[in-house]
Amino acid sequence: MPDASEIPPPPPGAPGTQFLCLTICGYRRPGMSEEDYRHHMTQVSAPMTQDLMVKYGVKRWTMVHNTSETRALMSRLFDHQMTQLADFDCFSQVVFESVEEYRRMKEDAWYQEHLVGDHEKFADTQRSRMTLGWITELIRDGKVVKGTQ
């Protein structure tokens, strides 16, 4: 079994087309409304974060907010295989090439001063979960693709 600190090799493909994706399955701070949570993430936190992410090589950053309304739509998709509804409030995905660059961003003095404390204003950081994996892109803009760009 490989050492957990070792970065696994990317899947086969052209250099510069293999990206890692950090997926954060987030919960909002207890007592915070869905509307306030989304507003803080998109209108307060994102504007403070996005330029720093670009500086450190982030290729893409998306947020998917799961609201009461969108969760209700899931009943239309359930079948014998899709039966379990995830209870996360948001899925935030950050795409980058280098774990080291992302770590450097988190160690940046500006990040430490402005963003670490901001997370506590909207997120339940003790319940939120995360994972990291290689992206395999199959369809983009309605077309079958070979590789991530």
Swiss-Prot record:
<dbReference type="GO" id="GO:0016491">
    <property type="term" value="F:oxidoreductase activity"/>
</dbReference>
<comment type="pathway">
    <text>Secondary metabolite biosynthesis.</text>
</comment>
<dbReference type="InterPro" id="IPR009799">
    <property type="entry name" value="EthD_dom"/>
</dbReference>
<comment type="similarity">
    <text>Belongs to the tpcK family.</text>
</comment>
<dbReference type="Pfam" id="PF07110">
    <property type="entry name" value="EthD"/>
</dbReference>
<dbReference type="GO" id="GO:0016829">
    <property type="term" value="F:lyase activity"/>
</dbReference>
<protein>
    <recommendedName>
        <fullName>Decarboxylase AgnL1</fullName>
        <ecNumber>4.1.1.-</ecNumber>
    </recommendedName>
</protein>
<comment type="function">
    <text>Decarboxylase; part of the gene cluster that mediates the biosynthesis of agnestins, dihydroxy-xanthone metabolites. The pathway begins with the assembly and cyclization of atrochrysone thioester by the non-reducing polyketide synthase Agnpks1. The atrochrysone carboxyl ACP thioesterase AgnL7 then breaks the thioester bond and releases the atrochrysone carboxylic acid as the first enzyme-free intermediate.</text>
</comment>
<keyword id="KW-0456">Lyase</keyword>
<feature type="domain" description="EthD">
    <location>
        <begin position="30"/>
        <end position="125"/>
    </location>
</feature>
<dbReference type="InterPro" id="IPR011008">
    <property type="entry name" value="Dimeric_a/b-barrel"/>
</dbReference>
